Design a protein with these regions (language model features):
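Aromatic "clamp/platform" in nucleotide-sugar-dependent glycosyltransferases that forms part
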Residues: 228, 247
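A conserved mid-protein helix/loop that constitutes part of the nucleotide-sugar donor-binding site
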Residues: 14-25, 169, 173-192, 205-211
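Conserved acidic donor-binding segment of nucleotide-sugar-dependent glycosyltransferases
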Residues: 279-280, 284-286
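Acidic anion/phosphate-binding donor-loop and adjacent secondary structure
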Residues: 67, 133, 148-168, 230
Length: 286
């Protein structure tokens, strides 16, 4: 059997990190032999352990983190993988050369200087693959493999948990609280939707800014900041529509999640949603 090693630094929360976990669990269920090297994360480690996946936690620090580099090489030498799959810049750039196929997965338009030692690159949208080709990456060594989401239907929760009345329109938006996600635009739009409530599930550096904005324009009582959640399917199942307002969104996993939960999806026409959604047929683009 092909032996796989996956390496990811990653943040505690994020779309790439969620998909990594989803893929690792899926590969394990399919019988793939694998081990994981990852940055310390209690919840992610628990999920992998419960599935029977061996993982080691490393610091994945900046340039002078010599221990992580040494440890990765030692694990590779002992495990002798056939394929190393690395995720994003930090993990990819410190994978040593060796007698294995090094594949990196990109979920954005990353600087390819971190990927010079890779044998193959995977983009999760055709647009990212086009970017790789335009950056002179060999055509036969860049590949399109889309993301997937779990197809389990969620169970609606009691709206009262988040002080939201029954019988009013309820929309949801999910993701890291970053300027690229344009949650500020969505919150401003709430001023025009007098009876609508918004559940905003995510965490990040823009939390205080977005909270202040909601207070300033008088919608704070109708905008509920839920923090980062692991029960997104249940949250989406509770709401009337899912909104993806991102200024920059290479893919948009939340669009896929909204479809699985059979909810209307409304999105700004950034790259990912524009690729996924056929306006007026399986969603709305603005």
């Amino acid at each position: 059997m092909v032996k796989l090693l996956q390496a990811i630094a990653g943040a505690p929360h994020g779309g790439a990190e969620l998909f990594f976990t989803r893929l690792a669990l899926g590969l394990e269920e399919a019988g793939q032999q694998q081990i994981i090297l990852m940055r310390k994360d209690k919840e992610r480690a628990r999920l992998l352990k419960d599935a029977g996946i061996y993982s080691e936690e490393l610091r994945f620090g900046a340039g002078f983190d010599f221990f992580t580099r040494w440890k990765i090489k030692r694990v590779i030498d002992a495990y002798k993988p056939d394929i190393v799959l690395s995720w994003m810049n930090r993990a990819t750039q410190i994978i040593p050369m060796g007698p294995f196929v090094h594949v990196a997965r990109l979920g954005g338009y990353y600087n390819l200087k971190y990927y010079k030692n890779c044998d193959h690159l995977i983009g999760n949208t055709p647009q990212i693959v086009d970017y790789l080709k335009q950056s002179n990456w060999p055509v036969g060594k860049c590949h399109y493999i889309p993301n997937f989401v779990n197809d389990e239907l969620g169970l609606p929760i009691d709206r009262a948990v988040f002080n939201t009345p029954d019988g009013v329109p309820l929309i949801i938006s999910l993701g890291r609280l970053h300027k690229n996600k344009a949650f500020d635009v969505l919150i401003k739009a709430m001023a025009e939707l007098n009876d609508t409530f918004l559940w905003l599930a995510g965490d990040g550096e823009e939390l205080s800014t977005l909270t202040s904005l909601a207070e300033e324009i008088g919608v704070r009582e109708r905008v509920k900041f839920l923090g980062w959640r692991s029960d997104t399917k249940n949250l989406i199942a509770t709401c009337d529509a899912l909104i993806c307002p991102s200024r920059h969104e290479p893919l948009g996993n939340v669009v896929l999640e909204g479809w699985v939960q059979r909810k209307p999806v409304i999105a700004a026409a950034s790259d990912g949603p524009r690729y996924l959604i056929e306006h007026g047929k399986n969603g709305l683009l603005s």
